[in-house]
């Protein structure tokens, strides 16, 4: 009995130590989550400004042509896949890879993995990888996004790939994060006046990027900004050159926003997972403590009984 009680006591201490770790990770994830959502929101003005400029150029030039708006010359796909650097985030990483498996089925795929888990996953599954230079999503900054965008644009313009898409995790709420994909190249939402919403932050705030069709600017003001005002703009050396030079910057802004949204999603998933782990640890400690106290009480009762029996026998 004594040995059993000692084992239970050690088990309680072990669970308490684990609970301290999970609670600390929960608090850290919650703190970082606020910063990640703010970074995604702060990237919105830059992205929207470039989007409006590209849309204006495409709209004001009927004979406009760009290698980035034409359909690819082949059926090869490049996927930029954003995953996490660590585990302990519920199904965050597994959901991304499962989604990508369904999305890329039957396609000639090359990936550009972002995040340690993404690099490890595709290396293990022997999927062609464009580069492993961006293995730590937490260390990626704006300059890295510009480098990735230039690399992708050069590969697409050179005919290496016919389609480029970005797989990231959308932040819907603290409880829900869903993997999704958005097409990067060829560009299509600039020739379509209505466009479409590319991504949303959900509870984190407003859309990190919107097309002009989803803009909250009144229709009359849109006409002024995208119509008469833009007709006075002179692009040097020409609008097509300006458009092509802006595209990499536009994609870099989109990529940076998506990375921050994915990081926010990972942190939310980790916070919820650690909260659940902490709750489970508390329940386990309560159960073990109850068992320990009962065993201790039984041991004391047995000792008293033995003493009384000995006294009566004497």
Residue ranges of model-derived segments:
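C-terminal beta-strand-loop-alpha-helix "lid" module of Rossmann-like NAD(P)-dependent dehydrogenases
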Residues: 1-314
